[in-house]
Regions:
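Hydrophobic alpha-helical transmembrane segments of multi-pass integral membrane proteins
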Residues: 21-28, 58-68, 97-108, 138
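Cytosolic juxtamembrane helix and N-cap/initiation of the first transmembrane helix
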Residues: 1-27
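Cytosolic juxtamembrane helix at the C-terminal end of the final transmembrane segment
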Residues: 70-79, 135-159
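Alpha-helical transmembrane segments and their membrane-interface junctions
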Residues: 27-37, 99-123
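Hydrophobic alpha-helical transmembrane segments and immediately flanking/interface helices
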Residues: 44, 114-142
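Loop-to-transmembrane helix junctions at the membrane interface
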Residues: 71-99
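Membrane-interfacial segments
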Residues: 36-40, 76-80, 110-118, 150-157
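Transmembrane alpha-helix entry/boundary detector in multi-pass membrane proteins
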Residues: 13-17, 39-64, 87-91, 124-132
Length: 159
């Protein structure tokens, strides 16, 4: 009975930590989407600085990273080979989260940065570049976690 309760507790903690990461990713994407559109329409124009946006992004990134690293180091994946459909959905969501990160990276570094003018605020650009790198890493970590879950859920399936 104690073992059953421990496994149930591990499942709840695992799902809670994964949910924190997924909700954080949705928040990042929803927050950055208007900027993404602005960069696509007006490459080279520096976006206006809003202190609250940077703070909210950093809080979301730190929260996602705390959940990821705690889960990775302390909470094993409690699901094994139970559903090929859930396995595929998890793998798909993992890839989908990183597609957005890849699209944002490509837009910023291959379209926006080459068009920047000499009057660009380099300190602001560096700060935003650091936040972008942190955001891409958080999305990458979420991708890894979803792929680990998908692999575990599909471990008993024939290829």
């Amino acid at each position: 009975m104690a073992d059953l309760n421990a496994r149930r507790g591990t499942r709840i903690i695992y799902l809670l930590l994964l949910s924190v990461q997924v909700i954080g990713a949705f928040f990042l994407i929803a927050t950055v989407l208007p900027d993404f559109r602005q960069l696509a329409l007006y490459p080279g124009e520096q976006l206006p600085y809003l202190r609250g946006d940077d703070f909210a992004l950093v809080v979301a990134i730190v929260t996602m990273q705390a959940a990821y690293w705690y889960r990775l180091c302390r909470v094993p994946i409690p699901f094994q080979g139970s559903s090929i459909i859930l396995s595929h959905m998890s793998l798909f969501l993992g890839r989908l989260s990183f597609i957005f990160g890849g699209a944002l990276f490509a837009l910023v570094f291959f379209r926006h940065v080459p068009e920047l003018s000499d009057s660009t605020d380099t300190a602001l650009m560096a700060r935003r570049g650091l936040i972008l790198a942190e955001m891409l890493f958080a999305l990458f970590c979420l991708t890894l976690d979803l792929e680990r879950l998908g692999t575990a859920l599909g471990s008993n399936q024939q290829s």
